[in-house]
């Protein structure tokens, strides 16, 4: 009888308390895919006069198993050097960039993604958190397989505005970045 009571209690516990279907790895991946635009960075670092930082041109794109940091230069913060596609894995709340082994605590709340570097406690002041807002670009805007790292393009200036909201100096630069469509002229 005692075994039956324990079984019954366990059944109702998991039935009513159990796992939230939105916390499953599949749900996290579905919410993660697409464009994320860097909103703010919290760290012991300097980006100019406080309150004047603008990270709008720093983006992070996710597909099922790859991520792609985008932006005009590597001087601004992002979770990995821009212009390269990285494989990643998620275990629980930890996102790992496979090529570098860097780990970030991942949290999605509504249209906000936060990635906090899992720091080495023996190194002072290496804590950094990135906060991204969900972008509006269609996920098909970027083709990860079309990215040409260190692509060679002419330096002609014939600007185009990519479907991701970033300006490129010419069509070749947009194509090398994996951008699938664009309009002539700079983004506004």
Regions inferred by a protein language model and the residue ranges of each:
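N-terminal hydrophobic targeting signals that begin at the initiator methionine
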Residues: 1-2, 20
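Sec-dependent signal peptide recognition
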Residues: 2-10
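C-terminal motif of bacterial Sec signal peptides marking the signal peptidase cleavage site
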Residues: 15-18
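Lipid interaction determinants
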Residues: 20-83, 89-141
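Extracellular/cell-surface secretome signature
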Residues: 138-188
């Amino acid at each position: 009888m005692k075994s039956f009571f324990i079984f019954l209690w366990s059944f109702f516990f998991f039935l009513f308390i159990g796992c939230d279907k939105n916390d499953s790895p599949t749900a996290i991946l579905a919410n993660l895919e697409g464009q994320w635009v860097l909103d703010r960075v919290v760290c012991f670092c300097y980006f100019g006069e406080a309150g004047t930082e603008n990270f709008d041109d720093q983006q992070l794109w996710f597909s099922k198993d790859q991520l792609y940091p985008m932006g005009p230069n590597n001087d601004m913060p992002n979770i990995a050097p821009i212009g390269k596609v990285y494989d990643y894995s998620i275990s629980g709340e930890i996102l790992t960039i496979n090529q570098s082994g860097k780990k970030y605590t991942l949290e999605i709340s509504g249209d906000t993604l936060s990635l906090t570097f899992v720091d080495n406690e023996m190194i002072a002041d290496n804590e950094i958190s990135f906060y991204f807002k969900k972008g509006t670009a269609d996920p098909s805007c970027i083709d990860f397989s079309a990215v040409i790292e260190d692509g060679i393009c002419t330096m002609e200036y014939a600007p185009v505005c990519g479907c991701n909201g970033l300006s490129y100096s010419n069509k070749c630069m947009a194509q090398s970045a994996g951008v699938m469509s664009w309009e002539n002229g700079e983004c506004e």
